[in-house]
């Protein structure tokens, strides 16, 4: 079976050591220009630009020039039903919930509305480099169905 192969070239954001250990000062950040060799959507290797990979002889290089390439961002706590009320003002939390949040979340019992917002929300996150999120839906099954249907798309 033929494998899908890609080569991406650009400035790769990486670390010499884990940035999560207590010796972070000794973990230097690199943005060197390199090539990423990908087989069936999985990174096979990251190599210097002059490296010739034997399995990628006839593959065109997608060169992003000096643009930065990094792993996707992770958002560990987001609420997709609040997309339409981002930056809505509230004097106190309970005011904000009663005036904006609860009425907006009730709209998610409509599958059409939930689907429209799910598409806008997921597209927005992906366009800004967020590839992983832990997102809340509403109490309505339609909000969950719309979210996961679009995410699977």
Per-region residue spans from a language model:
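N-terminal metal-binding scaffold of metallo-dependent hydrolase/deaminase domains
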Residues: 1-56
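Short, electropositive, low-hydrophobicity segments enriched in small/polar residues
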Residues: 14, 76, 133
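Flexible loop residues that form catalytic
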Residues: 15-16, 79, 138
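Low-complexity, flexible helical/coil segments
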Residues: 45-48, 72-79, 106-116
């Amino acid at each position: 079976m033929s494998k899908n192969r890609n080569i991406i070239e650009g400035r790769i954001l990486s670390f010499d050591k884990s940035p999560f250990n207590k010796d972070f000062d000794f973990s230097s950040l690199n943005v060197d220009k390199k090539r990423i060799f990908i087989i069936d959507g999985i990174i096979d290797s990251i190599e210097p630009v002059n490296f010739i990979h034997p399995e990628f002889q006839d593959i065109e290089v997608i060169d992003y020039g000096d643009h930065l390439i990094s792993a996707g961002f992770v958002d560990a706590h987001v609420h997709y039903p609040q997309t339409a009320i981002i930056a809505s003002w509230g004097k106190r939390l309970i005011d904000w919930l009663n005036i904006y949040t609860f009425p907006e979340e009730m709209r998610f019992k409509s599958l059409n509305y939930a689907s429209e917002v799910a598409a806008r929300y997921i597209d927005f996150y992906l366009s800004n480099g967020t590839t992983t999120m832990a997102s809340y839906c509403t109490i309505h099954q339609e909000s969950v169905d719309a979210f996961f249907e679009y995410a699977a798309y």
